[in-house]
Amino acid sequence: MHPKNSYLLINDYVNGLYSNVRVTEIRMCYANSLRLNREDMKKKILNVFAVALVAMAAVVNTGCSNESSLVTDGQPGNAGGDSTLVSFNFALQGFAAEKTVGTRALAAGTDGRVIASSVADAGNGLEVMTEVVEDAKPQTRAGEVLKPAPAQNYTILAYQDGVKKAEWVGRFDGTNFTVNADHSKVQAMKPGMYKFYVFSDHLKYQNGKITFGLANGSINALSNIVDVEIHDQKETQTVSFQLGSPYARVRMRINGFSSQAFEGSINGALKYKANTIEGTCEIDPAHGTVTYSKATQDGSLSYNHFTNNIEGDNENISNGTQAIRTSHIITPEDAGCYLLSGTHLNQLSFQFSSDASGTIYRKPVRNRELPLENLADAELETGKSYTITQTIYYKADYLFDDYKTVGSLVPNMKKGLNPVALVVDKDRHICMGLEDVPHVKDGRQWADNLNLKNIETENQDVNGLINTINRYDGWKQTWDMYTTDTSAGYIPKKRTKARNSHFPAFNALENYKGKTQMWYVPGAGEWHSALKYLGIADPTRGFTFDNQEHLEWGDVLGYRLLEVLFYQAGGYPLNDWYWAADDWKTDGKAKAVTVTARSTYAHFGGARKTDGTQVRPFVNY
């Protein structure tokens, strides 16, 4: 950051920044070429011009190589014996276009370089992971024609040895530059080296100084500096201005999980405190200096608008089914905020506006703040575009892949841990796996023979369901050999269901995720805890032998809560019918307890043990 009242020599700054950027010249000559005096003097061309006036950053003008003259020879003009005709080219360099940004790993798919990241508690049951991406520069191919600079007013100044030699003020219409009537179209200039300044009228030229600040930022605020040798020649010379922003552009992208994380109108602003960020810049062409000064009052830079909710791609999740896991909103190309070189993003915060009526996960965003102060000390540079990507997580506890750590996603993923299960009952330390056991054709049977049974069992009615729930015996039924009935003589030796292939649903967990005696088929008790956690107020309501009431998902989010909780952890929600570890005494123990969980309802039930369906594994910590 450049401290207040510190000065940088323009040429030093020009030669230091952007020395590797390559651009392509576009010719757009305008009428009324200007007649210049000349004398017998020639010099080498400096071969550098700046993309951004405020930083005086140099960009080498080239199509195929790193060196190319900024002055090009044209057709013979009508110059007199002591003058040379010149014309100007105007082209737009612009910023990089926004690319798709992943949400599971925040930088995945990002076209750019992550320069800072942080995590924070956003309040109201939400967490945020922030990454700042320096967007990739547009790639310019040899011979490619750049788009014209926007039609607007521009000023061109020519300085030599700190003295202004010429000034033109006029309007560029996309093809031609027309000088205003009150400015001479012909000014005397001797051949030699000149520093040309060109800038849109977002920048002001007064009392020999060029000034601009936070209030002047715009996608159309453009400038350039070109060091040029005016030759002693009869042919027209063309001075090329490839215009870039004198600001750093900062856009916002907010990611969420599920296909509809965002609803309603959402907008906001970057806020700052007095004396924390650069507020104005003053260029002194006569002395070759640049001075930055801090903003002296608290302020904010509002984004014009965000897009509405944008759905992510359809992704394969399980059993050949697809789902949309993510969604996002973003400030479009023309809706960024423009900050000065040297600004540090950790001196800013993002606040949703007071008139924002929208929601994230159906939580109101009005006046809420997403902090940036934990970001690494990242300094913005002139002419570059940045995207602040903030991914919003619904706060919940998960078990991580060390099988010890329990906590919310954001701080633990920042440590390099990966979630393996969602905590659904903290008192009993019960966790539900993030996905089903890998699918097999026709599903997995509870048992491949109806004579295979548990020792302890209940009738298939509401009282029997409640008694079965109260046992919380999923792990025991899976791993304790003494829970399996051997009276029929079918399993005299391998009574542990997880180790017996005659119990396919249990056997699938024998070495699940490389762990033994950890993962298990949940009993009715574990399922009861999970359904209550996920929004079913009373999972036993309406249960009978003949019918089961379809119980709607509660919570303000409904089934979307399941989508958010599982998608944000890299899994997927329940959407099938599943085995429980318990069986029913009714019908000669031929049926086992089941849970049906669809996008609109859930309930307990029962099915023949030889039917095939899904297994959602559970684990305790």
Regions found by a protein language model. Give the residues of each.
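Bacterial Sec-dependent N-terminal signal peptides
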Residues: M1-P76, P617
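Sec-type signal peptide cleavage vicinity
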Residues: N37-N47, V60-F400, L417-P419, N449-S487
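C-terminal, surface-exposed recognition/capping segments
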Residues: G525-Y621
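GGW-centered surface loops in extracellular recognition modules
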Residues: L380-V440
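Residues within well-ordered beta-strands of beta-sheet-rich folds
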Residues: Y197-F199, R251-R253, C431-G433, M518-Y520, ...
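Residues that flank catalytic or metal-binding motifs in active/ligand-binding sites
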Residues: Q152, P246-A248, K426-R428, Q517, ...
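Short aromatic-cysteine micro-motif
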Residues: V424-Y520, A524-G525, S529-A537
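A motif-centric signal for short, conserved binding hotspots located
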Residues: T331-L340, E510, G535, F545-E552
